[in-house]
Amino acid sequence: MIEADRLISADAVPEEEFLDRAMRPKLLKEYVGQPQVREQMEIFIQAARKRGDALDHLLIFGPPGLGKTTLANIVANEMGVNMRTTSGPVLEKAGDLAALLTNLEPHDVLFIDEIHRLSPVVEEVLYPAMEDYQLDIMIGEGPAARSIKLDLPPFTLIGATTRAGSLTSPLRDRFGIVQRLEFYNVADLQYIVGRSAQCLGLDLTQEGSLEVARRARGTPRIANRLLRRVRDFSEVKSEGAITGTVATQALDMLAVDTEGFDYMDRKLLLAIIDKFMGGPVGLDNLAAAIGEERETIEDVLEPFLIQQGFIQRTPRGRMATQHAYRHFGLTREE
């Protein structure tokens, strides 16, 4: 319910979009992290260009803020084509999708964010477009209605989602390339923070960039947001370079701890530890205990905590690990 208000939320914020676009890499050679994805996409793109074909349809999934839109833009740039952007909830009617598809040039990219939220009627129109580059359109109404087929130019559909499991099998099976984005390591994030600091004209030391990177929850979008807040702190509270000390003071003031946890993460972990004796606890009980929706816990709070080894999923529910106890200076009673 309050995810949008969190400083370390990985969700996009409209007022940040302009700055984020300016800091995004444009080509694969500028793309940092995700080495397996980068290597595979380089081969797929080169092969498609060598054949003179459109790139196969691409599904990109993973937690928010890891660069799905950035990768889609890079693909379009590397292929030398235009990209049209929309999102699942926006495409309410079949005609909305048809209008986009009929305006594509050969090999263009159509990027659909939140593709798991497509309506069934729109999805049905998408199937023949993806498979046969054809569009089935109904003309007229009632008994006089008839279907006509329109040929489409070869194009690449790039779908992005945080919930790949919510895609229907027929849609998922039509993607020739599927890429999962993982959380970034600290070294890659530090490089990204340094590059963003250059774009913003900041004097950021190695220690300063490291402090921002290690608290950014493995997520470039969060790293860039924290960097901007550290910049604000530095402009008011200090002079000169943003050092490790300045970054630490700023992030401590913002209540983002050394693991990148904010009060919601700490609330979740302490609920498991204090209210449920470390677990296991069912998701519904945990959601009620902290006043959040189960989807928020599952999609927003848990992934990073599980990846970092602070929560363990078991058949009987969630458990706090020894890492979680140590983070709060506690000892688990056996």
From Swiss-Prot:
Record-level GO BP terms: DNA recombination; DNA repair
Which cysteine pairs are joined by S-S bonds?
none
* Enzyme class (EC, first level): hydrolase
Q: Which UniProt keywords apply?
A: ATP-binding, Cytoplasm, DNA damage, DNA recombination, DNA repair, DNA-binding, Hydrolase, Nucleotide-binding
Alphabetized GO MF terms: ATP binding; ATP hydrolysis activity; four-way junction DNA binding; four-way junction helicase activity
Region feature Head domain (RuvB-H), mapped onto this chain: 258-334
Q: Record keywords: Transmembrane included? A: no
- Record has ATP-binding as a keyword: yes
- For the ligand (Mg(2+)), the binding residues are T69
Which residues of the sequence carry a binding annotation for DNA? R294, R313, R318
Q: Residues annotated as region Large ATPase domain (RuvB-L)?
A: 4-184
Q: Where in the cell is it found?
A: Cytoplasm
Name the chemical reaction catalysed here.
ATP + H2O = ADP + phosphate + H(+)
Q: Which CDD domains does this one have?
A: AAA (cd00009)
Q: Where's it mainly located? A: cytoplasm
**Sequence segments annotated as region (Small ATPAse domain (RuvB-S)):** 185-255
Q: Which residues are noted in the entry as ATP-binding?
A: R24, G65, K68, T69, T70, E131, D132, Y133, R174, Y184, R221
| GO CC terms | cytoplasm; Holliday junction resolvase complex
User: What InterPro entries does this protein's entry cite?
Assistant: AAA+_ATPase (IPR003593), AAA_lid_4 (IPR041445), DNA_helicase_Holl-junc_RuvB (IPR004605), P-loop_NTPase (IPR027417), RuvB-like_N (IPR008824), RuvB_C (IPR008823), WH-like_DNA-bd_sf (IPR036388), WH_DNA-bd_sf (IPR036390)
User: For this protein, what is the EC number?
Assistant: 3.6.4.-
Functional description taken from the UniProt entry: The RuvA-RuvB-RuvC complex processes Holliday junction (HJ) DNA during genetic recombination and DNA repair, while the RuvA-RuvB complex plays an important role in the rescue of blocked DNA replication forks via replication fork reversal (RFR). RuvA specifically binds to HJ cruciform DNA, conferring on it an open structure. The RuvB hexamer acts as an ATP-dependent pump, pulling dsDNA into and through the RuvAB complex. RuvB forms 2 homohexamers on either side of HJ DNA bound by 1 or 2 RuvA tetramers; 4 subunits per hexamer contact DNA at a time.
How does this chain assemble?
A: Homohexamer. Forms an RuvA(8)-RuvB(12)-Holliday junction (HJ) complex. HJ DNA is sandwiched between 2 RuvA tetramers; dsDNA enters through RuvA and exits via RuvB. An RuvB hexamer assembles on each DNA strand where it exits the tetramer. Each RuvB hexamer is contacted by two RuvA subunits (via domain III) on 2 adjacent RuvB subunits; this complex drives branch migration. In the full resolvosome a probable DNA-RuvA(4)-RuvB(12)-RuvC(2) complex forms which resolves the HJ.
Q: Which family does it belong to?
A: Belongs to the RuvB family.
Q: What is known of its domains?
A: Has 3 domains, the large (RuvB-L) and small ATPase (RuvB-S) domains and the C-terminal head (RuvB-H) domain. The head domain binds DNA, while the ATPase domains jointly bind ATP, ADP or are empty depending on the state of the subunit in the translocation cycle. During a single DNA translocation step the structure of each domain remains the same, but their relative positions change.
The protein's name is Holliday junction branch migration complex subunit RuvB
Source organism: Pectobacterium atrosepticum (strain SCRI 1043 / ATCC BAA-672) (Erwinia carotovora subsp. atroseptica)
